[in-house]
Amino acid sequence: MMDDKHGRYGACDRCRGQKLRCVGAGKPIPNSSSRLLRNEIPCDRCRRAKVECYSVRPAPRRAASNVKEQMIATQAASERSSSLAYHTSGPVVSPPNSLVTAASKPHPNSLSFNHPRSDAVAAPGGLQTRRQSRDTDSLGDMPSMPHEWMAYLHDHKMDDRQGLGMETPPLIESDLNLSRDPAMDSMHEHNMMMELIHQDHQEEWNSGPPELEAYPDPIVPPNPAPLKARKLTSPDCDDYPYGHTRRSSHTPTQPPEPAGRSCIQELAQFNEMLLRDKCSLEDTSARRGYKDSWLSIGRTLHHCQQFFSILKRIKYSRPDSQLSADRARSQWSSLPEGTSLADGAPTDSPQARRSLARGATPCSSSLARSSSTSSAASTSYLGLSTLLSILFCYTYILQAYEDILTSILHAVTRPTPTIPPTLSGLRIDGFQLDGHHTLQLECLLHVSYNLLEKIENILFGSAGPEELSNPVKYGILGDKLSAGLIDALFEHNETNGLLHCQGKREVAAKRLIREIQAALKQLDL
C-alpha cells in the first residue's frame, strides 16, 4: 500500500475498473469527494500513460477554460436529478455512511468480484478494513453537499454504462437498485400484465354478429361468410357442440386431384391446339386461294383419335356413370310395348321415325321424360366451359372430315372418276399400300367411320333400344335425341339424308362416307 503523503484517499475509477493499484500523485487530494479535484490532479499511472485520470466519468476532450463552467454544469445536472427524484416520488438518498455500508456488502450471486464503488483496494491482511474506516471518517467530517451527492449518483449511473466501456457487473446493478421504489416497480409490473391481458383479448376472434360501424361503406352490407370461414378453418380448434373444442392437426392435407379434372384440363389444351390449327389453315387457304384438304387427312385422323381418348377418360371418370346406367335400365324396363310419342305413334312405327328425324321433342311421353332426366343428370357435373370445348372440338373434327370427304366424293363421282391417293406411306405388316389408291381410300373410310361412331356413342349414347331387354346407355351429353344440336350445323337443306337405319340421326361426315363407299362399289376399280 502506498503512503498517506504520496497516496490518495481513494483510487481513481480507471485503475479501479482495471483492477490495478492506483499510484497517487505528489500531493494528496484534500477533498476526495470532489469530482473536479480528483480530475484536476491525475495519478502517476494515468500521467505516465498520458490518459485522462477520472473518477466518475471521462473528462471532456478539451481542457476546461475555468472551474466556473464545470460548476455550472454540475449544478444543472443536480437540478435535473432533484426534479427527477421529486416527480418519481423516490426515497431520499441515505447519508454517506449508510451508502458506504450498503455498498460494502457483497452480492449473494458474486463469487470473486468486489464492489466496484467501494474505495477499498484488495490487499492482504486487515488493510482493507483500516482503509474503509479511514474513508468513512473523512466522509463524515465533510460538510453536507446535497446537490453534489445527487450529481454523483446521476453521474455514477452514466459512468457505469458509458465511461468504462464495458458491461456492467451484477454488483453495480444491485447498487443501482438500492434507490428504487418497490411501489413503482410493482406498478410497472402490473401495467405490463394488464397490457398482455388486453393484447390477448384483442387477438381473440369475435364470434358475434359483425357491427356495421366497422365497415366504412354503409351501402354494401357486411358479409359474415369470410368471418365464419375464418372461424371454421382456424388451425387451432374446430367447433363442436356444448362448447367442446378439438385440437386439429397442423399438417396440411391436400385432397388428391380427381381424374376428371386432369381430363378436363387436357380437353382445354386440345381445344386451344385446334383453335391455332384453324387459324393457321385459314391463313394458308387465304394465301393460296384453295383449301388444302388432302394434306390434312393425317392430321384430322390424329385429332379424331386424340379427341376420342379424352372423351373416353372423361366418361369413365365421372361420378354418376354407373348411376345413370342403372336409372336408364329401370326407366326402359318400365315402358310398356307400343308406347306412343307426342303424335300418338308407337316407337317402332315409321311415323315415330319421321318425328325423330324432324327433331321433335315429345315431352309428354315417358321416353322424353327419361331422356331429359338422364341428360340433366349426366351433364350436371360438366361446366359450361367444358361443354363448349367438347362441342367446338367435335364440330371442328366434323367440319374437317366434311371438307376431305366432299372433295373425295367429287373426284369419285365425276364423269371420268379418279381415286386420289389418301394414305401415302401406309404399310400393313410389310405390305406397301403406295399405288393402291382404292385400298387406301377404303382403309381411310373404315377407320374414320369407326372413330366417328365411337365418339358419337360417348357423347350422345348408343342408339335407342331395339328390344326392351337392352337398356339405353346415355352419353356425357345426353341421349341420341340431343344429336340434333350437331346435325343442324350440317343438314340445313336436306331432309331425306337424315333418315338412316331405323330413324337414327347421323352427321354429314358419316353420310358422305356411305355415299363414297356406294360409289366405289359401282366403279369396280
Swiss-Prot record:
The keyword Nucleus applies. It comes from the Eukaryota. Disruption phenotype: Leads to reduced growth and sporulation, but does not affect virulence in infected mice. Impairs the production of isoquinolines. Transcription factor that regulates the expression of the gene cluster that mediates the biosynthesis of the isoquinoline alkaloids fumisoquin A, fumisoquin B and fumisoquin C; as well as small amounts of fumipyrrole as a shunt metabolite. The products of the cluster lead to a brown coloration and are important for growth and conidiation. GO terms for cellular component: nucleus. Residues 80-142, 204-260, 327-371 are annotated as: Disordered. Residues 95-115, 327-337 have a biased composition (Polar residues). Induction: Expression is induced by the cAMP-dependent protein kinase A signaling pathway. Residues 12-53 bind DNA. It is found in: Nucleus. Its main location: nucleus. PROSITE patterns: ZN2_CY6_FUNGAL_2. Keywords: DNA-binding, Metal-binding, Nucleus, Transcription, Transcription regulation, Zinc. This is C6 finger transcription factor fsqA. GO terms for molecular function: DNA binding; DNA-binding transcription factor activity, RNA polymerase II-specific; zinc ion binding. Gene3D superfamilies: Zn(2)-C6 fungal-type DNA-binding domain. Disulfide bonds: none annotated.
